[in-house]
Amino acid sequence: MAEQEVKLMKGNEALAHAAIRCGADGYFGYPITPQTEVIETLAELKPWETTGMVVVQAESEVASINMVYGGGGAGKKVMTSSSSPGVSLMQEGISYMAGAEVPGLIVNVQRGGPGLGTIQPSQSDYFQATRGGGNGDYYVIVLAPNSVQEMADFVDLAFTLAFKYRTPAMILSDGVIGQMMEKVVLPPIKPRRTEEEILRECPWATTGRSKGRKPNVITSLELKSEVMELRNLHLQEKYRKIRENEVRYETKFMDDAEYMIVAFGSAARIAEKTIEMARAEGIKVGLFRPITLWPFPTNEIAAAAAKVKGVLVAEINAGQMIDDVRLAVNGKVPVEHYGRLGGIVPEPEEMVKVLKEKLV
């Protein structure tokens, strides 16, 4: 592999290439549409022969996330990927990782639900991802790509944030981004960390007891309530720092906007075409795209909403992110929703129509 390569490939394929190139130590996954190309691409590339990266098709999603738990606990950069019902099966393991402060990467290429649902794209896992889908008071860092390029770029970013804060991180994609093909600039190759680097950078890791230090213990269990409360307070302080320092977002056409569309992922791509069509009719619309769904850009949306007459939240679901947008706007201007369900992707023409009917 060259230092940097320009390719035409699917989002799922780009993510697999990026995992190898960012120095990942292991991938543990299980096939499920529409993300199966991730593990297929890794199997085809055989990184165990080049970088030494381990690739395992586990017996289930439950096994996959617990392999990530174990690898992350040893200070390794490890990851898994799945789609909506598969990620639901991982929630216990993700909660354990959050409680034990184990870094790792989970990728959700969303499909429609509830239940087995459909293999078509959706954004209906927003609540699960941003509220901590398992038990307990915890959050995971959630990045929402809206292009094949970001599918590649966010792998290294997610690992960086996961290890910086000792927490699970998630890339919340969907079947549109996972399956679409675009030009992508694959990142430069980053070698896997040596055992010495892991010992230096992750002094908490269970790497085997070194001479002269106490053994490391990784667990989410505390039997004394007072100690468990202190652990939880420590986690909440960490989440406060993440909220303070790691909010990411993008705005477009907001300088003269009278109305604002808030959308993430593939819905934001559709919103851009909507804005182009609306502006051609003289309706001044801008885009606010949250990149981190958690931490959510609450203050930034509030500031942007203060300059417009109304907000339209566009999602491929029945209305989930709109709750966070309404909390941010705090009743200052009208906030309306437009979404499609069952794996149906919204059309820009429909979005323009809803914008006119509900806000303009």
Feature annotation, model-predicted:
Residues 166-251:
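Conformationally flexible catalytic loops at phosphate/diphosphate-handling active centers
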Residues 7-44:
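N-terminal glycine-rich anion-binding loops that anchor highly charged ligand groups
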Residues 10-14, 236-259, 272:
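Glycine-/acidic-rich phosphate or pyrophosphate-binding loops and their flanking alpha/beta elements
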